[in-house]
Amino acid sequence: AHKIYGPKGIGLLYIRDGVTLTPLIFGGGQESGIRGGTENVPAIAGFGVAAKIAFNQMRSTMRHEIALRNYLIQRVLHEIPFCQLNGSHQNRLPGNANFSFEHVEGSSLLMMLDAQGICASSGSACASSSAEPSHVLTAIGLSDELAHASLRLTLGRNTTKKELDLVVSILKETIDQLRSISDSYLNRISR
């Protein structure tokens, strides 16, 4: 539910007719015998309210996220050299932008951004906790090096243009710092 601004720790599992699941937690038969334990009624109700709000605001949220995502992509691609957008420019989630920055290690970039209050992730959403390069990014043709140098930024319905301006400013400064100690970058620009 937290993905749609609802409470954390509650979700929904749709089970198609004919599919049998084995419970991980046995107990009193709650949740149709799929998971034992007391159901969190306030969280369930909160999820329901969040779903209703998300549905009612879906079109306006999408328009808002698409406009800001396109603004972010345009600024990053035009202001940070040796950068690329990963994936399609058009066919992508409204609030998602994934970039790769040559001559930058993704984990160092993440730590430095985090220290400045910027929440981001490296790789794809499917593999953000893995030390291996994202199989999604390598499947779309990125080298292991570029997959490791990727940064995923996501936007939401409350994101503002002013926040994105700050993110781009901090991102540029941080990448400049990291590249200033990168032998491959220094060799490339000295040619």
Residues of each region from the PLM?
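Active-site PLP attachment segment
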Residues: 1-49
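Solvent-exposed alpha-helices and their adjacent loops that cap or buttress functional pockets
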Residues: 4-7, 14, 23-25, 77-78, ...
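A general structural signal for well-ordered alpha-helical segments in protein cores
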Residues: 7, 41-44, 51, 69, ...
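Structural signature of PLP-dependent enzymes
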Residues: 51-74, 84-93
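Hydrophobic C-terminal alpha-helix "anchor/cap" residues
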Residues: 76-77, 113
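A short linear hydrophobic-aromatic micro-motif
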Residues: 82-87, 120-124
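Conserved C-terminal alpha-helix-loop-beta "cap" of PLP-dependent enzymes
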Residues: 97-152
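PLP-dependent enzyme catalytic core of the Aspartate aminotransferase-like
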Residues: 128, 132-191
